[in-house]
Each structure stands twice: as structure tokens, then as C-alpha cells.
């Protein structure tokens, strides 16, 4: 759940000129989805980085801190520093009837040292306590990819991704041509294991 400014700076550092307005994030997609489906003024419990909190406020959602504040929705986004108590509050809120939204289902994310748990692992913690799945805004769901094509005015995009189960599947779900790169969680050996 990095801010678009961080991603744009990263792309620019790699030699790809980019402005924050060129970046569409799953954090933007999930807060937009909640605002569209539930409306402004919706109380949301956020289990994600402060960037998601900021985006929620920009969309006139009202972040709350605990299930006892009766949130109407829970928004989960990746947070490498998530506290266990935050996941517990998310579980309590969903158990009490709050709608559950997530930015992406990535079980892992690559680092220089190897794979680490991703948002999908954090979702599994809450999921172990409830009887439903979250509504997904990011890949492989369509909202993020459609928002990207709309914002950039793409007519025949090629989606580049390093995860077969989210990036490439998401492109396929949206009818977008994809290019699989070997820089992330999946490699050549996974092509025969994951059927898309």
C-alpha cells in the first residue's frame, strides 16, 4: 500500500519517467470501491498503512480505530508493520457485520532476501475468524486494471507482471494482453503448476 509518489519515484530511479498521476494503486482502487459502493461518510476500520488512511479521508470515508466504533466496512491493505491487535479488530468488525474489502490477495512478496508474507497472509488471519471472503479491488479483480486503462487512456494495453495468480490472471480477467516477467514470486517452473 505504497503511496503513488513512492512508486513514481521508484520508476523514475529505474529510468522510467513517471509522475504520481501516472500510477494507479490497489490502495486507490480499494478506497474508491468502498466510497462508490457505500458512499461518503462511511465509517471504515483500516488495517493497512497510513497511505490507505489518507486515501480514505480524501474520498470522504471516516476511519475509525476499533470494532467498538461500529465501522460499516473493513479495508485491508498490505502493511509490513501490521500489529496483531489491528487484525483482531478487523476480525471483530467483520464478525459484527462490517463489509470486508481488500486491495489484493498476494500471499507473498519478493524481497532481496527472499519471499515474505504478503497481504494474502494477513487476509488469511482475518479469514480464519469469519465466514466470508473480502471483496477484492486489486488484481486479479477488474477494478484496478480498468481504472488504470481509463486513467491512462489505453486502448490496447500490455500488462506486465511477475505473479501468475494475480497479475497475469487479472490481465486475463480484464481481457488485457499480458507479459510475464521472472522478477517476482513466480518463475518458469510455476508456469506448469498454475493453470490460467
Regions from the PLM with identified roles:
Residues 1-66:
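Active-site phosphate-binding/coordination module
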Residues 56, 61, 160-192:
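Acidic, Mg2+-coordinating phosphoryl-transfer loop and its flanking beta/alpha structural elements
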Residues 68-81:
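Short, well-ordered secondary-structure micro-motifs within conserved domains or adaptor modules
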Residues 83-105, 178:
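A short, gly/pro- and small-residue-rich
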Residues 99-123:
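Histidine/lysine/aspartate-rich catalytic loop segments that bind and position anionic ligands
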Residues 134-169:
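Conserved Lys-Pro-Asp/Glu-containing loop-to-beta segment of HAD-superfamily phosphomonoesterases
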Residues 194-196:
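Conserved small/polar residues in nucleotide/adenosyl-binding loops
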Amino acid at each position: 500500500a505504497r503511496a503513488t509518489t513512492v512508486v513514481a519515484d521508484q520508476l523514475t530511479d529505474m529510468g522510467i519517467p513517471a509522475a504520481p498521476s501516472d500510477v494507479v494503486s490497489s490502495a486507490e482502487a480499494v478506497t474508491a470501491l468502498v466510497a462508490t459502493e457505500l458512499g461518503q461518510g462511511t465509517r471504515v476500520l483500516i488495517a493497512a498503512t497510513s497511505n490507505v488512511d489518507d486515501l480514505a479521508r480524501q474520498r470522504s470515508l471516516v476511519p475509525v480505530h476499533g470494532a467498538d466504533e461500529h465501522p460499516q466496512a473493513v479495508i485491508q491493505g498490505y502493511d509490513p508493520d501490521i500489529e496483531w491487535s489491528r487484525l483482531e479488530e478487523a476480525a471483530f468488525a467483520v464478525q459484527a457485520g462490517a463489509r470486508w474489502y481488500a486491495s489484493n490477495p498476494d500471499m507473498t512478496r519478493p524481497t532481496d532476501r527472499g519471499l515474505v508474507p504478503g497481504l494474502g497472509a494477513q487476509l488469511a488471519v482475518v479469514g480464519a475468524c469469519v465466514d466470508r471472503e473480502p471483496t477484492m479491488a486489486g488484481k486479479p479483480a477488474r477494478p484496478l486494471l480498468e481504472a488504470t486503462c481509463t486513467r491512462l487512456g489505453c486502448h490496447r494495453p500490455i500488462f506486465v507482471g511477475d505473479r501468475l495468480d494475480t497479475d497475469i490472471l487479472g490481465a486475463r480477467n480484464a481481457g488485457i494482453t499480458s507479459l510475464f516477467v521472472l522478477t517476482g514470486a513466480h518463475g518458469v517452473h510455476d508456469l506448469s503448476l498454475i493453470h490460467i
